[in-house]
UniProtKB/Swiss-Prot annotation:
Mg(2+) 1 binds at E432, H434, E477. This is Beta-galactosidase. It comes from Yersinia pseudotuberculosis serotype O:3 (strain YPIII). GO terms for cellular component: beta-galactosidase complex. It is an enzyme of class 3 (hydrolase). Its cofactor is Mg(2+); Na(+). Keywords: Glycosidase, Hydrolase, Magnesium, Metal-binding, Sodium. The active site is at E477 (proton donor), E553 (nucleophile). PANTHER family: BETA-GALACTOSIDASE. One of its GO terms (molecular function) is beta-galactosidase activity. It catalyses: Hydrolysis of terminal non-reducing beta-D-galactose residues in beta-D-galactosides. The record marks H373, H407 as: Transition state stabilizer. GO terms for biological process: lactose catabolic process. PROSITE patterns: GLYCOSYL_HYDROL_F2_1, GLYCOSYL_HYDROL_F2_2.
Length: 1066
């Protein structure tokens, strides 16, 4: 008897009897009466509908409002609930997580299990959701055939009843559970009841770094199949060595009653037909009866067949050119009449590891990947098509070509969209035991083998027809045990067309075809006990190691992070066996919550009263929860771009462009170039880009650099745009860019200016004399008393405090322009990377923030050591020395020289000396609180988005203008943000600053950022806070739990000097 023919127990068990077995605490019981896994079915009854992928009348959705009752434990559910709704039941949408609808609370933890660790036991207080709904069926469904119910995702375990009769049980939150309802259905109204448990023994295998939520969170539908029907379909493509021909191999199995399986008259009367379509063109077709060749001495399979179609000159599938065919598999009866048809998108592509390289269609691929959780700020883990498509389009637009389904099989629609739009996918089993000690405790326990096994094998059986899936993953962070080795072999036997990866046990066990470490660094070894992480350059050179290395996680993008990302891409392009990786991760996993006034905000761990929790560690995304970009997304886009540029010469001006596309011509690209002087274009042009895959071409842009009529920095900007829209991008989408600083040509005033100067020279001389006389009348004035030193020029007055030595006021027409004095600044509001794993209950002394705290950086006591004034012939100079100490230990010394001239300018030279005992400071700079609030900020420097010394590959030097509010990056957990580096001019209202500096400008002070837990709690302060840095430490980002700022980006010198010129335009 096949599994499809298993009938329910003849004696129906009562609800208390069923619950008393506590199946949810038995790892060897993962299901009762659940049907075998298979690819998604639609059961079309005509070929054209299957070929065109029309909605199938044989499917009926059960999404919508269900009746819902909540209990704190399953034993509290009244027995009569399985037959009728309870009086207190309320409507609840399906799909949804019940925690987002007022029941129970979501819990965020990373490693720690949210329940006491006592596998397979779970707490007696086990939140339980009771769902029910009524439905009616077409009479034809009841007259013949089989009706199934399919739950695409239920967390974490559930029991099912139909019309008061128990149907079955299932666990594994991320794979479909399918049951035959046929014996329980009746004419008219039918009632489905589902009891969902929050915790089960399966929860010990689902310890992923994510929100822990419950409920029916994916689609529910009914499917009607004929009595004799297609049971499984496996599609594979095999390409010739030259990729000029292919075999399409289809293995199809038919459900036939077991008593008829050995009757050749029965089995031989059914035929299977495969038709391959390219759009509306029939490319190939083959039909043959059921049955295979003899498998062993007992003979062949009689309920399945293998069909092989040869295709000449197939159009190949890749992420760059995702060409899809459509295979329609039809089951025919002895009269050649269609019984049913199933259809799948087919991509002809080959995945292989050859000579130490992962290759797609014979070409070594560079994985531009990202890890993605299924997450939406409003709906949690219930994701609709619009959200899925939004993620894919954003990934494609920002030069991603791969995604890892971290850490579980995704919604079935995700793979279809990846097939269609072109993304390589790592499909990962729903297994993580990170909170076990050791992690391999369960994977080495035979009693858990079946639970592990089903999560891998059922994933493969559901998803293996998708061309986008190029790698299978055995799960995440579960150590390494005998179970992994066994499942690795199972996959290699059942699907020899794809490699397998698994990071557990050190990323280099026999259970992985790919070295897939997480957070290994480019040049730095991390010799952890048992599982060392070598530098990626070193790893590929270890003895007897020939596998490709693809980081399964790297570049931890938590908050203001992602520093040093460009270093990885320099290594990837330098060493062929370093084939990229998957950034952690795509989206900030924050949930929409509401404060006491009903106002929404983005919440993280602990905001729902959830314990235990790991606070803001859920927010590691390249995009905010609403999918608006973090600045780090642009850095990824630029580093991963498919075109690389080099400047060959400046006279003539020639550049070289290399295409890193493996398969597509650059037939929709236009090259734009501009020569920029101080942010203004002086020469520009454009031309079509015609590059073959993996080719380079030189482009002659100009015969010589333009003659300049004013001094300044000269830059060459190039960018590539797509003139026409594509399925994933709008017209004029910018896909790549680069910038070079050009050598400075001689400054040659224009002839018009020269002639005008000669003609008007006498008048100019007279004007200059008048201007000099006016300057004498409005010379710099100096006033001193016991409390202040004042320097006055026309309507401006600079006031110094003799006590602090600071510029404590800048008067303009008797109006104060400073709310806080101009002073040194050496600290920043800690980044997540600065904090590391330090929390209130656990202090990591190695974290930057702890080192700064211990050294007293946040409690510095300032003293004015000296204050000198010199009134020179054309200026006033004030020299001040400041000492900073903690607990009477001198830590920093700064020497400021202020020069005031007769143009109303204040130029400050700052020299800072750092004690050798002090940890490297976060910044060397100054800050003040301006009284002004101007709507716009303009600057000449790197922009337009936020950038830091170790994250500025994507930023470009130019003249930028943004609204003030956009100068603050609204990270959900407030921290240092908004810096713009390598600035030469800053204009804010009437203020102008010049020099070579970094700056940040905002309505929020560093102090407020330091003490505020959430972005929505920040309160705009009076005026504007201006931070000017001569030097700023990098942000780091190789990971977020250990110091990861590279030594080149740490302020390790003992002395620093910078200069800033301030001016207020009266």
């Amino acid at each position: 008897m096949t599994s499809q023919e298993k009938v329910p127990f003849q004696v129906q068990l009562s609800l208390p009897q069923i619950l008393s077995r506590r199946d949810w605490e038995n790892p060897q019981i993962t299901q009762y009466h659940r049907l075998e896994a298979h690819p998604p079915f639609h059961s079309w009854r005509d070929v054209e509908s299957a070929q065109k992928d029309r909605p199938s009348p044989q499917q009926q959705t059960l999404n919508g409002l269900w009746s819902f009752s909540y209990f704190t434990q399953p034993e509290a559910v009244p027995e009569h609930w399985v037959r009728c709704d309870l009086a207190e039941a309320k409507p609840l949408p399906v799909p949804a997580n019940w925690q987002l609808h007022g029941y129970d609370a979501p819990i965020y933890t990373n490693i720690q299990y949210p329940i006491p660790v006592n596998p397979p036991r779970v707490p007696d207080l086990n939140p339980t959701g009771c769902y029910s709904r009524d439905f009616t069926l077409e009479p034809s469904w009841l007259a013949s055939g089989k009706t199934r119910i399919i739950f695409d995702g239920v967390s974490s375990a559930f029991y099912l009843w139909c019309n008061g009769q128990w149907v079955g049980y299932s666990q594994d939150s991320r794979l479909p559970a399918e049951f035959d309802l046929t014996p329980y259905l009746q004419a008219g109204s039918n009632r489905i009841a589902v009891l969902v448990l929050r915790w089960s023994d399966g929860s010990y295998l689902e310890d992923q770094d994510m929100w822990r939520m419950s409920g029916i969170f994916r689609d529910v539908k009914l499917l009607h199949k004929p009595e004799i029907h297609l049971r499984d379909i496996h599609i594979m493509t095999h390409l010739s060595p030259e990729f000029t021909s292919a075999n399409l191999e289809v293995m199809a199995a038919v459900n036939i009653p077991s008593l008829q399986l050995n009757d050749p008259q029965v089995t031989g009367s059914y035929q299977l037909r495969v038709q391959l379509w390219l759009a509306d063109k029939l490319v190939a077709s083959l039909q043959q009866p059921l049955g295979t060749q003899a498998i062993d001495e007992r003979g062949p399979y009689t309920d399945r067949t293998q069909l092989v179609l040869r295709i000449d000159q197939p159009l190949l599938w890749s992420a760059e050119q995702p060409t899809l065919y459509r295979a329609v598999v039809s089951l025919l009866n002895h009269q050649q009449e269609l019984i049913e048809a199933e259809a799948y998108d087919v991509g002809f592509r080959q995945v292989a590891i050859h000579q130490g390289l992962l290759k797609i269609n014979g070409k070594a691929v560079l994985i531009r990947g990202v890890n993605r959780h299924e997450h939406h700020p409003q709906t949690g883990q219930a994701i609709d098509e619009e959200s899925l498509l939004q993620d894919i389009l954003l990934m494609k637009q920002h030069n991603f070509n791969a995604v890892r389904c971290s850490h579980y099989p995704n919604h079935p629609l995700w793979y279809r969209l990846c097939d269609r739009y072109g993304l390589y996918v790592v499909d990962e089993a729903n297994i993580e035991t990170h909170g076990m000690q050791p992690m391999s405790r369960l994977s080495d326990d035979p009693s858990w083998f079946s639970a592990f096994s089903e999560r891998v094998t059922r994933m493969v059986q559901r998803d293996r027809n998708h061309p986008c899936i190029i790698i299978w993953s055995l799960g995440n962070e579960s150590g390494h045990g005998a179970t992994h080795d066994a499942l690795y072999r199972w996959i290699k036997t059942n699907d020899p067309t794809r490699p397998v990866q698994y990071e557990g046990g050190g990323a280099n066990t026999l259970a992985t075809d790919i070295l897939c470490p997480m957070y290994a660094r480019v040049d730095e070894d991390q010799p952890f006990p048992a599982v060392p992480k070598w530098s990626i350059k070193k790893w590929i050179g270890l003895p007897n190691e020939s596998r490709p290395l693809i980081l399964c996680e790297y570049a931890h993008a938590m908050g203001n992070s992602f520093g040093g990302f460009a270093r990885y891409w320099q290594a990837f392009r330098q060493y062929p066996r370093l084939q990229g990786g998957f950034i952690w991760d795509w989206v900030d996993q924050s949930l929409t919550h509401h404060n006491d006034h009903g106002q929404p905000y983005w919440a993280y761990g602990g905001d729902f009263g959830d314990t235990p929790n790991d606070r803001q560690f859920c927010m590691n995304g390249l995009v905010f929860p609403d999918r608006s970009p973090h600045p780090s997304l642009y850095e990824a886009q630029c580093a991963q771009q498919f075109f690389q540029f080099s400047l060959l010469s400046t006279t003539p001006l020639v550049i070289n462009i290399t295409s890193e596309y493996l398969f597509r011509e650059s037939d929709n690209e236009q090259l734009y170039w501009r020569i920029m002087l101080e942010g203004e274009s002086v020469l520009e042009g454009s031309q079509p880009l015609n590059l073959s895959p993996e080719s380079s071409q030189c482009y002659r842009l100009a015969e010589k650099l333009p003659t300049l009529n004013k001094p300044g920095q000269l830059w060459l900007n190039v960018e590539i745009r797509q003139p026409k829209e594509t399925p994933w991008s709008p017209a004029q989408h910018r896909s790549a860019w680069h910038q070079w600083r050009l050598p400075q040509p001689l400054f040659s005033p224009s002839s018009d200016l020269t002639n005008a100067t000669a003609h008007y020279a006498p008048q100019l001389q007279h004007n200059l004399q008048l201007q000099h006389n006016r300057q004498l009348q409005h010379d710099l004035q100096l006033q001193q008393d016991e409390q202040h030193i004042k320097v006055t020029y026309q309507q401006q007055c600079w006031q110094f405090s003799r006590q602090t030595g600071r510029l404590d006021q800048w008067w303009v027409a008797d109006k104060p322009m400073l709310l806080r004095p101009l002073q040194d600044q050496f600290v920043r509001a800690p980044l997540d990377n600065d904090i590391g794993i330090s929390e209130a209950t656990h202090i990591d002394p190695n974290a930057w923030v702890e080192r700064w705290k211990k050294a007293g950086m946040y409690q510095l006591q300032q003293r004015c050591l000296s204050l000198h004034v010199d009134h020179l012939s054309h200026s006033v100079q004030i020299s001040a020395e400041y000492g900073y100490e903690f607990e009477q230990e001198p830590l920093l010394h700064s020497h400021w020289v202020y020069r005031f001239d007769r143009h109303g300018r204040m130029t400050i030279d700052v020299n800072v000396r750092i004690a050798t005992s002090l940890p490297a400071p976060a910044r060397i700079g100054m800050c003040c609180q301006l009284a002004d609030i101007s709507p716009t900020v303009e600057w000449l420097g790197l922009g337009p988005h936020e950038n830091y010394p170790d994250r500025q590959l994507a930023a470009q030097y130019g003249h930028w203008s943004l609204p003030l509010e956009q100068m603050h990056t609204a990270y959900i957990f407030p921290s240092e943000n908004g810096l713009r580096c390598n600035t030469h001019t800053l204009n804010y209202g009437r203020w102008t600053l010049t020099g070579d500096f970094h700056f940040g400008i905002s309505r929020y002070s560093t102090q407020q950022l330091m003490v505020t837990s959430h972005q929505h709690l920040l309160e705009p302060e009076e005026g504007t806070w201006l931070n000017i840095d001569g030097f700023h430490m990098g942000v780091g980002g190789d990971d977020s739990w250990s110091p990861s700022v590279h030594i080149d980006d740490i302020l390790t010198r003992e002395t620093y000097q910078y200069q800033i010129c301030w001016q207020y335009k009266v």
